[in-house]
Amino acid sequence: MTQFDHDRLLIIDFGSQVTQLIARRLRELNVFCEIHPFQNVTDAFLADFAPKAVIFSGGPASVIDANSPRPPASVFELGVPILGICYGQQVMMQMLGGMVERGHGTAEFGRAYVTPQGDRPELLNGWFLDGREQVWMSHGDHVSRIAPGFEVYGTSPNAPFAITADLARNFFAVQFHPEVHHTPNGKTLYENFVRLAGFTGDWTMDAYREQAIAEIRAQVGDGKVICALSGGVDSSVAAVLIHEAIGEQLTCVFVDHGLLRKNEAQEVVTMFREHYNLPLIHADETELFLSALDGQSDPETKRKIIGKLFIDVFEAKAKEIGGADFLAQGTLYPDVIESVSFSGGPSVTIKSHHNVGGLPEKMGMKLVEPLRELFKDEVRALGHELGLPASFIGRHPFPGPGLAIRCPGEITRPKLEILREADAVYIDQIRKYGLYDEIWQAYVAILPVRTVGVMGDGRTYDYACALRAVTSVDGMTADYYPFTHEFLGETATRIINEVQGINRVTYDITSKPPGTIEWE
């Protein structure tokens, strides 16, 4: 089964940071969807894509500005349901004859409450059962006059046209973001939309597996693939999937860059050689990486150095096996959106990612990224589909640059050893308390400061470290984990007593946003 066997929903991306969450919510409903940037959606594209429904994403622009993003007018002539979200509502209203105005005292950012107005359309089945709905707003401009044919079905204090619809054409538009978790009943709205559009929910991880295998075979042909295997869930699922697709045409390379956790290198090599029978080259390049990182403290510089050296190593290993045509990576959606908009649209860059921003434009191999359109929980579901053990699939994410981005400032061997030991104690504590599976990601960061302490009768002047643990569904947003004081106190005591070089332990309670999950 390929993607063309499915009815497809088109998401037109206007640059919102949460466009990928729209796709995530639809995938939870087993609906096949694709995200495409507005500038790529032409009349010819629409005719070829033939969507069964269309969603307009939000975005940072103002429809009032000249040359603001907009879809082709022909999208409204397709005869399919359309849902506009935030900026998507505003562009729909303006293009269909309504009016949008600048927000002067009417902007809404954050939690808001929408109350119903008029009869309840099918889109709102299951809504307003308690009289109002909590939603997440993020808009400066606002609709001041709805387009002909539209009616109002929900209002908020600063958005009198919070929910509008033209029921004759199945056009719907909302000012809020139903895709984020801060709109608790948002999933119900999407369920209603895809149901009225006629989707049957036939897209599953089994279907994705078959589709991905077919696409890998079509892309690779008779070529050789070298896979960047880190031992993390992402690269491991990618490796097993690619191996299922092309067998011995795949060679995995595990690079020990000297930035791995305690005992990690040997565990990875043993696991994949003995249990998964994958062709594996173990390249210990500790000296190469640490020498290149010596004296570097800027996080972007560190990421770029690591990314470049990864490519250098893979190209060298490819030559050793007689040449490779493709480089495989376990790149995911959040990796890409945090580097630059996945769609190439106007989304704002947050940070470069080692799988993306660190790659030279003219590398010697083409990329194979079979997980590029998946979120972490989908990768785990795919791993289960591929037969990987649950204990492995449930491992916390670990970044490609490894401990380099958990060591703010300059990287030294002594600091890395301290960090490894502290991290091992912390994770042991989390497992001891039975909390590992409740947490999305947990780690220790060693801080670039020393603090004065007293141990016994002596003065110490050692490093401080920060514990980090977050809960998340998809990595796009995250909250800190609410450990008990007992846990934090016991963990701090263990680290200070068992890890030479640390005399102060802190706990990072920053959510994402405004912070990111990793320190760098």
UniProtKB/Swiss-Prot annotation:
Homodimer. Residues 8-202 form the Glutamine amidotransferase type-1 domain. Catalyzes the synthesis of GMP from XMP. It comes from the Bacteria. Pathway: Purine metabolism; GMP biosynthesis; GMP from XMP (L-Gln route): step 1/1. GO terms for cellular component: cytosol. Keywords: ATP-binding, Glutamine amidotransferase, GMP biosynthesis, Ligase, Nucleotide-binding, Purine biosynthesis. Residues 203-395 form the GMPS ATP-PPase domain. The keyword Transmembrane helix does not apply. PANTHER family: GMP SYNTHASE [GLUTAMINE-HYDROLYZING] (PTHR11922:SF2), GMP SYNTHASE-RELATED (PTHR11922). PROSITE patterns: GATASE_TYPE_1, GMPS_ATP_PPASE. It catalyses: XMP + L-glutamine + ATP + H2O = GMP + L-glutamate + AMP + diphosphate + 2 H(+). ATP binds at S230, G231, G232, V233, D234, S235, S236. The active site is at C86, H177, E179. SUPFAM superfamilies: Adenine nucleotide alpha hydrolases-like, Class I glutamine amidotransferase-like, GMP synthetase C-terminal dimerisation domain. InterPro entries: Class_I_gatase-like, GATASE, GMP_synth_C, GMP_synth_GATase, GMP_synthase, GMPS_ATP_PPase_dom, Rossmann-like_a/b/a_fold. Its EC number is 6.3.5.2. This is GMP synthase [glutamine-hydrolyzing]. CDD domains: GATase1_GMP_Synthase, GMP_synthase_C. It is an enzyme of class 6 (ligase). One of its GO terms (molecular function) is ATP binding.
